[in-house]
Amino acid sequence: GNKKLSWRDDQQRFRDYLQKPLGKRKLSTITKSMLTRVLSDAERQGKSVGTVRQIRALASSLFTKAVDWGYLPASPATDLKVSGTSVSRDRFLQPDELARFFEAVVAEPNETVRDLVLLALLTGARRSNVCAMHWREIDLKAGVWKIKRTKNGEPQTITLSPEAVEILRARQAATANGFVFPGTGKTGHIAEPRKGFARILERAGIPHGRDTENGMVLHDLRRTLGSWQARTGASLAIIGKSLNHKSQQATAIYARLDLDPVRQSVNTATAAMF
């Protein structure tokens, strides 16, 4: 039931926010200001106020237990403040970056990274779901991907564009059963390819990383899909596909978007793809 779900969420939150900065420290050396820093870091990363409160609640219950069990005289997690002003991330690929980005993805020598990044972009799914994509969730004939459990605990059905189906067909030949992106770790599937994504962005001349000004992270691809659909009524699949046609058609679509920088760079991108 839900208990199991929240336990798993707590584990994930512990790993994501507490283990890295504090995992190697002795309990008795952890101070209130360290925990405050954990919360403000999460806010700076653009985590929602709800998520930051959940991290605070988790820290609070962990240290209360440590006091109950006699490991600590008092909890450093009492009265931790949440500012309530998370920096909302609204980074997505800009018109003038899109063509450079496609070009850089196509030039990526690691096929797995290339396919994963393109699928993240074309499906708008969460990176954790793309990494853990399983063949049994995918119906290529119907062009559908049924995710059993997403971050919010709900199942989700994603329509796969012809481009996404094409990428998956090519992968299917290599990894017919199990995970679409097998990995060597405990989970059996790939972990988020941070280095590979950074490589692609570097190649495209786009800043990367949460701590870099205007830097992109893999999760921003999810936002990119929504922003472009909202802005143009054209799906990214169509925009991406336009790069696959000789430049006349591609330029026509970009012209419809009425975005000058894209029109200039689209020819370079199309040239790179052929």
Language model feature labels by segment:
Residues 45-58, 68-133, 141, 147, ...:
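Basic, Lys/Arg- and aromatic-enriched nucleic-acid-binding interface segment
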Residues 45, 49, 99, 103-114, ...:
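Short, basic (Lys/Arg/His-rich) helix/loop patches that form interaction surfaces
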Residues 74, 136-144, 234-253, 264:
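Short, polar N-cap/turn motifs at the start of nucleic acid-interacting alpha helices
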Residues 28-41, 78-83:
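Short, conserved phosphate-binding/catalytic loop or strand-edge motifs used
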